[in-house]
Amino acid sequence: MATELEKALSNVIEVYHNYSGIKGNHHALYRDDFRKMVTTECPQFVQNKNTESLFKELDVNSDNAINFEEFLVLVIRVGVAAHKDSHKE
């Protein structure tokens, strides 16, 4: 039986594949699908951010796509922000 952390990691992978698979390449999240993903899946995180500049920051190899490793940087950023919010009173 999967642990809570294993379930959470599976969900992260599933979200990535749901959007990266739109264009048929499960290893690349393209600009328009990235925009759709962040505005749908983490709207509070991106409400005051430019998705284009965020895409460029994450695309460290400059191939105009976000691979899974680059996507995990976004997951970390959102996780850190959510953790901070969880401690606000």
UniProtKB/Swiss-Prot annotation:
SUPFAM superfamilies associated with the record: EF-hand
Positions with a binding annotation for Zn(2+): H17, H27, H83
Swiss-Prot/TrEMBL GO biological process terms: apoptotic process; astrocyte development; autocrine signaling; autophagy; chronic inflammatory response; endothelial cell migration; innate immune response; leukocyte migration involved in inflammatory response
Keyword Membrane: yes
MF term (GO), any: calcium-dependent protein binding
Gene Ontology terms: cellular component: calprotectin complex; cytoplasm; cytosol; extracellular space; intermediate filament cytoskeleton; plasma membrane; S100A8 complex
Further information: Binds two calcium ions per molecule with an affinity similar to that of the S100 proteins.
Name of this chain's protein: Protein S100-A8
Organism for this UniProt entry: Rattus norvegicus (Rat)
